Amino acid sequence: MKKVIFATGNEGKMKEIREILGDLDIELLSLKDAGIHADIVEDGKSFEENAQIKAKAICELTGEIVLADDSGLEIDYLNKEPGIYSARYMGEDTSYHIKNAKLIERLEGVPDEKRTARFVCAIAAAFPDGSMKTVRAAMEGRIGYKESGENGFGYDPIFYLPEYGCTSAELSMEEKNKISHRGKALRAIKDELR
């Protein structure tokens, strides 16, 4: 069985990933599962560059196939903020409840049609032979007026999906994986792992 490391320590993200890649004949490990404690500086200028930096570094360290993602929220009215800084927005130790409240506050008085946003996910697959494949996907929506929903994590409770009439935190894991930015990107990279 092929071993694949997904370069994350985020258990919520790993749950989502295992759901989508679970039918592949691979042993899928998180950094924690693989016993890796690497502090990689993500200094790329795009989601793609950051994913590639992470995947390459862990692949070189382990000699295994490594998947890494960089994802975030782009809000059009805020010039695509928080963008590649989504995880570090307002500081890494700031809870998403506080981050979400701040974004809602920054959009106070902004009408629905100008609250457009997207979740973006870039996934890089680094292989021991030095090759790399990168994909990018997005999920379009808008920023809601309050947090809603218990499923998901991060900015999900404020990311409203008009066609579903709810936030991404109100979708089941199965529903979310069908339409999410990460789900789309994982399905796009899946063939590289067969």
List the model feature ranges, each with a label:
Residues K2-I5, E11-R194:
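Anionic-ligand binding patches
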